[in-house]
Amino acid sequence: MENKDRLLLIDGSSVAFRAFFALYNQIDRFKAPNGLHTNAIFAFHTMLSSLMERIEPTHVLIAFDAGKTTFRTEMFADYKGGRSKTPDEFREQLPFIKEMIEKLGIRHYELANYEADDIIGTLDKMAEAPNVNFDVTIVTGDKDMIQLVDGNTRVEISKKGVAEFEEFTPDYLLEKMGLTPAQFIDLKALMGDSSDNYPGVTKVGEKTGLKLLQEFGSLENLYENVDSLKASKMKENLIADKEMAFLSQQLATINTKAPIEIGLDDTLLKGKKVDELSQFYDEMGFAQFKSKLLAEAGGEVTDEKVVDEIDFEIVTDGSISEKVNADDFFYLETLGENYHREQIVAFAWGNAEKIYVSKNIDLLTKMKFPENTYDFKKNRVLLSHLDIELPLVKFDAMLAKYLISTTEDNKISTIARLFNSGHLATDEEIFGKGTKIALPDDAVLFEHLARKIKVLALAKEKMMAELLENEQEHLLSDMELPLAEVLAKMEITGIAVSQNTLEEIGAENEEKLASLTREIYDLAGEEFNINSPKQLGVILFEKLQLPVGKKTKTGYSTAVDVLEDLAALSPVVAKILEYRQINKVQSTYVKGLIPQIADDGKIHTRYVQDLTQTGRLSSVDPNLQNIPVRLEEGRKIRKAFVPSKDSLLLSSDYSQIELRVLAHISGDEHLIDAFKHGADIHTSTAMRVFGIEKAEDVTANDRRNAKAVNFGVVYGISDFGLARNLGITRKDAKNYIETYFERYPGIKTYMENIVREARDKGFVETMSHRRRKIPDINARNFNVRGFAERTAINSPIQGSAADILKIAMINLDKALSARDFKSKLLLQVHDEIILDVPLEELDEIKVLVKQTMEEAIELAVPLKVDENTGKTWYEAK
């Protein structure tokens, strides 16, 4: 039989509440020596001990609600609104339940804006990932969790107090209710939930809901065929409450992609903290629990994870060349993430059999580095601080893991878990995080580094085997690794930024903000805090009596989409939107960029190569890809980015690269023909979709609408989305989309085929075989499935475009180096590459860059690059 780890996930909020009422009739009997009520603590402990003995989990996580306000209350303000006040006697015990859990060696977790259900659902899905081997048991008092049952996950619902549970599996759910897990969500959507205070459909209870689902299969199918129902009050209610039914469906659906900051490693069961737990039992008056604890401990106290021992040698000085083999791994440790500002604190190298660690950084100058590492780019930059130029390695475990799967992070602890290459504590456990980051004792530091080397060495063979099986080994050797070297050079070079220019722009913005503030006060008739959503809501919706768009638990929504809908109704709203835009530029980009300028007068951003699902690059510290360009105040920020002396900035931008990729992979003859003949693709689309015979008759508005259709289709836009973007009716938008597919049938065929492929394989690929998993492609929930289908359609397009850009950067770097040009790559932003070019090289470099980028890959249509130069990034764009 397959040996699986056992993960126990407990809905702490739900179970603790039930524990409180399980012994509520005896509440006066359960008091600590200091007078604290302990009935909930005692009952929770009893339940937990019973579960631990029965299930014998290897991993445990107890999730709690973080508060009343969640993303669901933003969707529906009255969500859980009808609940009675939480008893004070229960509320006072909750912190002690959490303290007890910690002392039992069990992890608990809560996440702002999310419920315990979402934390559990997210971890449950993590446990279903490839190369992860868990049986999952979920314990809760909330039936919503039933939607999570599957072949690996069972849900136990507490029935009476905390002693009796009803176990749900897919077979039991089908036998008991005639439903699949996905249909259970639709049942909640129809009948509502009085506990969570959402209504569903008027007068539809469990019996009627079950009948409807057994007939129609799903909520979506029911509403697609609602006209087939015979005339009745129920039919009227279904039609009248359609919007609420689908909202209830969303409210009932557990978010399995919550942004939790823990992984399955964090749920590994630790030993009990016997001394601390014994003292806690004394404080609570739990003599029986203490006696059992001490009997189990047998005088031995431990709170450490049981892990295998590891041998390593500490190197302090002397020659190390004989200790380094080419096929070893090496790893450089820093405290912080921004390696442009951090120094190496220790390093390690070796293989699964022999590992060396050291804090003597001078030894690095004598090292012939091995050919395997983790995060080559980071290492290249760090070693440049020591005037060491690290040669390109043959294997980077971080990049290999990223290519294999983008659904998890790429930390070494994650690699250890996924590729079964040993136990590794997380960096947060060793170093802390945030303001509490600090170096541990040398013994702890050295062991942690040694374990990293061992994990990497053991994982490499398995990772390479998977890359070969997926036909992705070339992506590592020919694309991601060479690109890492190019990006490292770009980061080290940096781009010059004028602080004076930023300060001048900042002064202009402050004047505009002051002027706008006065105008807003005049239009509002009084002064108020424009940055306060609460005060702004009162002004707009109470004083000025503008129509209320959305309402949240804390008041009126003043989100951008709400204000945009109101802009035509009052001049003050337009001024507020303008104020917000300029204020955002001022705080994020003017004030935010100045501290990022290094002593050399440059900004050295960090390119994140292993983050996005599509393969696109992103940048941090600072993020230079998000500088707003639609607003003039945002574009002006680029005036501060300047070339080196006697040079210009050259901006080379791929023209409509994603549409060209779409033409290639769809094979649509009309789209291909338009690009081959150099036609303006948006004008061409306007003619074909809007029935305009001559190009000269296409108006600017026609072209703008056609552009929205072209790019909307790439992102799988709906008729609703297109109607909103263009300010037209949904009927007209639907007609545009249908006509588009009639005129470009190859695109329609591509979209149908790629969705079918995603359903069959569970993933889609770029032209270079870069994979993106589409886990929700077969989801029963219409909205979830629809998003997955749009992702499947867009990912090969966006990912292939990203790959082309990477190839161009690699080839361009090679060309510059081969001919000893002084010109340097500086930035990569979206589809644009920016170079610093000495004036004497300008003519030659412009030809070289354009040719290199346009010949990066051969498509069915030509690639086109637009070039501009300037004394600032603003001028070059």
Curated annotation (Swiss-Prot):
Q: Establish whether keyword Nuclease is in the entry.
A: yes
SMART domains annotated for this entry?
Answer: 35EXOc, 53EXOc, HhH2, POLAc
For this protein, what is the EC number?
2.7.7.7
Per UniProt, residues of the 3'-5' exonuclease domain are: 308-468
User: What GO molecular function annotations does the UniProt record carry, in alphabetical order?
Assistant: 3'-5' exonuclease activity; 5'-3' exonuclease activity; DNA binding; DNA-directed DNA polymerase activity
The UniProt entry, under CDD domains, shows: DNA_pol_A_pol_I_C, DNA_polA_I_Bacillus_like_exo, H3TH_53EXO, PIN_53EXO
- Mind telling me which Gene3D superfamilies this protein's record contains? 3.30.70.370, 5' to 3' exonuclease, C-terminal subdomain, 5'-nuclease, Ribonuclease H-like superfamily/Ribonuclease H, Taq DNA Polymerase, Chain T, domain 4
Query: Which major enzyme category is it?
Result: transferase
**Catalytic reaction equation(s):** DNA(n) + a 2'-deoxyribonucleoside 5'-triphosphate = DNA(n+1) + diphosphate
- UniProt entry tagged with the keyword Transmembrane: no
Q: Which UniProt keywords apply?
A: DNA damage, DNA repair, DNA replication, DNA-binding, DNA-directed DNA polymerase, Exonuclease, Hydrolase, Nuclease, Nucleotidyltransferase, Transferase
User: 5'-3' exonuclease domain spans which residues?
Assistant: 180-270
Which GO biological process categories is it annotated with?
DNA-templated DNA replication; double-strand break repair
InterPro entries according to UniProt:
3'-5'_exonuclease_dom, 5-3_exonucl_a-hlix_arch_N, 5-3_exonuclease, 5-3_exonuclease_C_sf, DNA-dir_DNA_pol_A_CS, DNA-dir_DNA_pol_A_palm_dom, DNA/RNA_pol_sf, DNA_polI_exonuclease
Question: Which family is this protein grouped under?
Answer: Belongs to the DNA polymerase type-A family.
Q: What does this protein do?
A: In addition to polymerase activity, this DNA polymerase exhibits 3'-5' and 5'-3' exonuclease activity.
Q: Which NCBIfam families match?
A: pola, PRK05755.1
Q: Subunit structure, per the record?
A: Single-chain monomer with multiple functions.
Protein name from the UniProt record: DNA polymerase I
Species of provenance: Lactococcus lactis subsp. lactis (strain IL1403) (Streptococcus lactis)
Q: Which gene encodes it?
A: polA
